[in-house]
C-alpha cells in the first residue's frame, strides 16, 4: 500500500518536471519573440519525451581521472533527496504525516549540498570544482535566512507541522501580515535553487556549466530533474506558507487544484524572472544575504516572537 502511495506521489511530480522544461522553453521563446520547441509532436508537446529518450539512451561517459563511485552516487543522491522532500507536503494529505515536517524539509535540503560538492570533487575538473564550491557556498548561505523565515512563520503557526498552516490561514493568508518575510523568502528560494539572477554556479563565460560540466546522458538528466523538482517544491512550499496552501474562499472544496494553481503562478514568476534579469556578481550575491537579508530576518523573527507575548496572544491556561 505504501509503495502504491509513493508511486502515486512520484509519477505526477516526474510528469510535472518533464512538462516544466517544455513550459520554460516555450515561455522564454515567446518572451524573446521566437516560437520555442514546435517540431516534436503537436506544438512541440512531445519534446520532453524526446529529450528523455535521447538522454537515457546515450552512453554515460565519465572522465578517466574521476572517482567513478562518487561520480555516480552524486546525481542519484541529488534526485532521491529532491523527491523525498515531497513526502511531508500536505496535498491535502501528506505521504508521511510528521510532527516536525518543517525540520525534516530543512534537514533534507541541507543534505543536498553534499551531492553538489561530491559531483564537483569527483569530476576531477577545475571548472566543476569551482562551480561546486560556488554553489555550496551560495546554498549554505541562503539556507540561514530560509531557516529564520521558517522559524518566524512557525511562531505564528504555533506548530512545526505544515498541515496546521491551512487552519492558521483560514481567516487571512500570511502573505498580508508577513509580506517582508515573503519577499525575502521568494528571493532566497531563487538563490537556493540556483536560478537566475543567482545562477552563479553555471556562469557559462567562466565555468562552462558549473558542477555538472563533466556529466552526460543519464547522470546529467538526474541533476537536471533534481533541479526542476526542487523548483516546483519550493514554490509549493511558498504557496503553503504564505498563500493558504489549498485554502480558497471561492472554491474551498477544490483542495489540490487550489494548491496547484498557486504553485503554477509562482513557477511562472520564476520563469519570468529568468527571462528578465541579468546574473548577479558573486560579491553582490553574498552582500545581499549577509549584510541585508540576515539582519532583517533576525529583526523580524524577534518581532514575531515578542508581538504575541506583548499582546497577550497566548493560549489560555486551563
From Swiss-Prot:
GO terms for cellular component: mitochondrial inner membrane. It is an enzyme of class 7 (translocase). Its EC number is 7.1.1.2. The keyword Transmembrane applies. It catalyses: a ubiquinone + NADH + 5 H(+)(in) = a ubiquinol + NAD(+) + 4 H(+)(out). Its main location: mitochondrion. InterPro entries: NADH_UbQ_OxRdtase_su1/FPO (IPR001694), NADH_UbQ_OxRdtase_su1_CS (IPR018086). Keywords: Electron transport, Membrane, Mitochondrion, Mitochondrion inner membrane, NAD, Respiratory chain, Translocase, Transmembrane, Transmembrane helix, Transport, Ubiquinone. The chain crosses the membrane at residues 2-22, 69-89, 102-122, 147-167, 172-192, 231-251, 253-273, 294-314. It is a multi-pass membrane protein. Core subunit of the mitochondrial membrane respiratory chain NADH dehydrogenase (Complex I) that is believed to belong to the minimal assembly required for catalysis. Complex I functions in the transfer of electrons from NADH to the respiratory chain. The immediate electron acceptor for the enzyme is believed to be ubiquinone. Belongs to the complex I subunit 1 family. HAMAP family: NDH1_NuoH (MF_01350). This is NADH-ubiquinone oxidoreductase chain 1. It comes from Bradypus variegatus (Brown-throated three-fingered sloth). The lineage of its organism: Eukaryota, Metazoa, Chordata, Craniata, Vertebrata.
